[in-house]
């Protein structure tokens, strides 16, 4: 999987070097990105992070557009410095002039939401007694943290029920 993406990063750098007649330091490329973002350029670290799930699901467009988008951020930063806007004029010129691509700010990939597990906690209030806790909050309770109902001031207790959104 990474060999095609790394080859595209290299191709984008060569295009920029041919255009600007100078060399650019190559970034570290990582596939450690999750969630909604397809890619992120860390300017000061010269690091590109890509979302492997979105890459697998949208491979052709991802290689063409997303990789160039993130490389353009690093090139713009190295050419024009840290004071430029992330999707400003300089970045747009690189996207259009070097890569011949539309300077789209955001992707339109379908992002699958992961299912959230909720742990139901209860108090003694008759009308206000269900409190769905996240896994993180549930684990904090297991480590001794206490949560209280704002109405009756009783400690919330795990009911044993688990739901999935």
UniProtKB/Swiss-Prot annotation:
One Pfam family, short name: SprT-like
Compartments where located: Cytoplasm
Domain of life: Bacteria
Annotated active site: 70
Listed InterPro entries: SprT-like_domain, SprT_Zn_ribbon, Uncharacterised_SprT
Cofactor: binding comment: Binds 1 zinc ion.
Major subcellular location class: cytoplasm
Cellular component GO terms, alphabetical: cytoplasm
Alphabetical list of PROSITE patterns matching this protein: ZINC_PROTEASE
Co-factor requirement: Zn(2+)
Binding locations of Zn(2+): 69, 73
Domain SprT-like stretches: 10-157
Molecular-function annotations in GO: zinc ion binding
Keywords assigned: Cytoplasm, Metal-binding, Zinc
Listed GO biological process terms: response to stress
Family: Belongs to the SprT family.
PANTHER family linked to this entry: PROTEIN SPRT
HAMAP family: SprT (MF_00746)
Descriptive protein name: Protein SprT
Gene that specifies this protein: sprT
């Amino acid at each position: 999987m990474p060999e095609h993406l790394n080859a595209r990063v290299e191709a984008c750098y060569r295009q920029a070097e041919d255009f600007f007649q100078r060399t650019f330091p190559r970034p570290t490329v990582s596939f450690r990105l999750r969630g909604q973002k397809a890619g992120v350029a860390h300017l000061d670290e010269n690091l590109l992070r890509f979302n492997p799930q979105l890459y697998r699901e949208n491979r052709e467009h991802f290689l063409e557009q997303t990789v160039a988008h993130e490389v353009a951020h690093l090139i713009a930063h190295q050419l024009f410095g840290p004071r430029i806007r992330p999707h400003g004029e300089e970045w747009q010129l690189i996207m259009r002039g070097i890569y011949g691509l539309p300077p789209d700010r955001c992707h339109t990939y379908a992002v699958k939401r992961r299912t959230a597990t909720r742990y139901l906690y209860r108090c003694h209030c008759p009308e206000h007694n269900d409190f769905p806790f996240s896994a993180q909050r549930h684990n904090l309770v297991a480590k001794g943290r206490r949560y209280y109902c704002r109405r009756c001031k009783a400690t919330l207790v795990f009911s044993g029920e688990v739901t999935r959104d």
